[in-house]
Structures are given as structure tokens and as C-alpha cells.
UniProtKB/Swiss-Prot annotation:
Residues 146-352 form the ATP-grasp domain. Binds 2 magnesium or manganese ions per subunit. It catalyses: 2 D-alanine + ATP = D-alanyl-D-alanine + ADP + phosphate + H(+). It is found in: Cytoplasm. It comes from Chlorobaculum tepidum (strain ATCC 49652 / DSM 12025 / NBRC 103806 / TLS) (Chlorobium tepidum). Signal peptide: none annotated. HAMAP family: Dala_Dala_lig (MF_00047). This is D-alanine--D-alanine ligase. Gene3D superfamilies: 3.40.50.20, ATP-grasp fold, A domain, ATP-grasp fold, B domain. One of its GO terms (cellular component) is cytosol. Belongs to the D-alanine--D-alanine ligase family. Cell wall formation. Pathway: Cell wall biogenesis; peptidoglycan biosynthesis.
Amino acid sequence: MSKQTVALFFGGKSAEHEISIISARSIAAQIDRNRYELSPLYIDRDGKWHASECSQQVLDTDIAALLRSGTPESAGKRLDELTAAAAGECFDFGSFLKNTDVAFIALHGSYGEDGKLQGCLDTFGIPYTGCGLTASALAMDKVLTKLCAMNAGIAVAEFMTITSCAYMANPLETIVEITKRFDWPLFVKPASLGSSVGISKVRNAEELAAALENACGLDSKALVEAAISGREIEVAVLGNSDPLASEPGEIIPGSDFYSYEDKYIKNEAKIVIPADLPEGVAEEVRKAALTVFKALGCEGMARVDFFVENGTNRVILNEINTIPGFTDISMYPMMMAASGIGFAELVEKLLLLALEKRSITHKI
């Protein structure tokens, strides 16, 4: 039987560029080379697609070690060196279309997780892992995700949407409006970034102004959200029409909240899988994860994040990630492993789900 070619997309224009590379390295190590030919496809920070030689060199670079070396800027420097050396290479889009059987998308954040690439691949009839265009776009936007979840009966924290234009036009009025509506502390988040990029916990008006400046500089709108006193619980979901939910996992942050630095540089957070939850709460969280997954029209995979409120055990949606991390410290593969699906099997299932999804859409 001839091997199928898997195009592994990684890198990208988002702030999660390095994390995408780390995820791709983990995925590449688990792809069954007896069944698949791997064709790495690196997208640099400027959005340029690189030919296989440069892409393989980037994939071979241990970005995680560079990030944790104490000089994270060395990761960016190394990537710049590789792409500069490959400046004369020309990506052959025609060959890509002809030879690719299925795409594994390991891009996180904007221009990879938000539906843009999914729409491009749909146009050319290339099946791909994870959610389709619409679900990807909805899930990428934390505000739209909350509205869909509320419509499906899932609790969310009190929130308010601030457009970057409105804030820049009248920052003082925006801050006054927020302070009237919310108690301290609260969270400010870019509406469409992942890996906790740009998130701030604020305790006063001065910190609020700085947090809004930061979030609005990263995205076209910001989400202001009441702080929830509770445990951070996550669930991995896998499947198309009949998805399954994993054992829940718990993150115990090493700081005020599970920040980008906590996740990928300091690595101080404690992870507990399965989460030690009161009787009935674990099943409620799993059911809520499936409800959100279906409400958004997700396919393939997603990680759904919740709070379990202290004192009440109320299950409150935080967010959903349609292309969760696949690093060695990422919750999604670890929760699946705790549910009986190892990393290699998980990668294989995601590729098969992508092909299954394509076979269904081709009948329409």
C-alpha cells in the first residue's frame, strides 16, 4: 500500500509561533512513517511558506530548550538565521496541492487556528485535522464562544467587550465604565489570542489602563471578565459526529493565573490528571465540554477549559481551544493518555478523522 503524504503546518504569524514549532516537533515524532510520508511546512512570522529543506531544519531545532535557556530571544534569532539562509528557496504551491493527501495543522492562534487556513484548504479540497472554518472562527473569538455557550445553557463569567477603536478614542470613559460594572480583581484578555498571551489580572484602575493598552494593541477587541474564585479544570474532546470527552485535568498555577510564562518558560504549574473532583462534578464538566464542542460545530479535536467555582462547585466555561498544544507539557495529549489514548494513537486518530470528514463533505 502506498504511503499518504501528511503536510504538517507549523510556525505562523501569531504570538504563539514558537509554541507551534514545539507542538509540531512532538507530532512529527509520533506520525507512523510506515503509513505516512511527512512533509513539514513552516510558515515564518511574515507569513511566508517555506520549502521542505528549510521547514525540516526549523522542525529539527529544539525551540523549547532555547525558550527555557534564560535567553528566550535566542529562539527568534535561530529562526531568523534559518529563514535568511533559505531566502532563495521557492515554495512550490502546485506540487503541494498535487502531493498532499491530508494536512495536520499545528498552528496556534491567528492565521492558523482562526479559520483562515481552513478555508484555504477547503477551497483546494485538502482534508485537514481539527475544526472547519466556521467552528474555528467562532472558537477563536472568546466573546462569540461565550455567547454560543450561553445559548446552549453553559454558565460563563460576567464579561464586557471593548473594541480597540473605542478604547483608543476615549480610554478614560472606558475605564470608568468598567470600574462601575466590575469589582476587583478582574481579567483583561485579547479576544482572539491563545496560550494566555496578553492576559492581565488587574486590581486597580492604573493596572486596568495598562492591561487595556496591552490587549488592544494585540487584538481588535478586548474581553474584560470578572475573576472567578475556583479551580482550573480542562477536558480534551476528540471526534466528529460522536465525540468523546477525556478524564478532566486540573492546572494548579505557579502564579496568580496560568500565564504564558507559567506554561512554557517557568514551567512551575502543577498538573493533576485525572482531577480530584467531588462526586458528580467530573461528569458534569465532561458533559459541559461536549455541549460546548457541539454548540460551536467543532470537529476533530478541542480542549475545553472551565472553572469549578469554590464553595458552589458551579461549572463555568473559560474558553475553548480548537488546536490545543501538543508539547510534552500540554494538557490535551496528557488527558487523552489518561483516558487510554496514547500520543501516537491520538495523532493517527486525528488524521483518520480528517479523512472521514472529507469523505462526508464530498457527498454533499
